[in-house]
Amino acid sequence: ISTVAKALKQSGINSLLLSIDAFHREHISLDKVYLFAKAVSDECISGFKLHPAWVVKREEHNKYNEETEECLNYFVDLQIPITQGNNIFPSGNAAIYLSEFYEKKPINLSMKCGEAPYTERLDNVETIAINPNGDVVVCCFIIGNIYCDNIIDIVGQYNPCTNPMIGALINGGVRELIKLAEEYEITVDTTQFYSACDVCRNIVKRLSLRIT
């Protein structure tokens, strides 16, 4: 653990958010996370903060938020700053396992990437994610793999205009993506989803098998 913390310090990293919440505790014991947090804190890495995730919002009273508060208290002696955290929205597993906490509302299908929380325009990307298998991801689109190509090349070669799904989202939002899916005989029942993002991810997953 100390070796990893020192490596992070040497890399020049200037922002590090450590997920602390009820959901991560199900898979990783707080004792182990505490040791990592202390090691990073001892290295004085700038921008190191604890980053919780809240069901609906922090002020909402439910068992998951109560457990997350308990998790944060576990680290109180380290005096690590805490971010406001993320408000979980019902998409993916959250829509399956946390549906009781959310109400289905009419979905704005004209919504474009960058208008929903935690999203950005696909033609003005500032954030990427790298999955454990090396996939480089922009939102839910895989644009390369670091085990196959250099990350600089992957980012430099990203062109949203070459992907018809991205083009549809940029031009007309989720509604345009649905039209594209229908051209490939893919039907979408939007009443089964909680958000435009959830509709989008479902279509992209299914449509990618037809287009690529």
Q: Where do the protein language model's features map onto the residues?
A:
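Alpha-helix boundary/capping residues
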Residues: 40, 75-78, 157-161
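Radical SAM/AdoMet-radical enzyme domain recognition
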Residues: 1-75
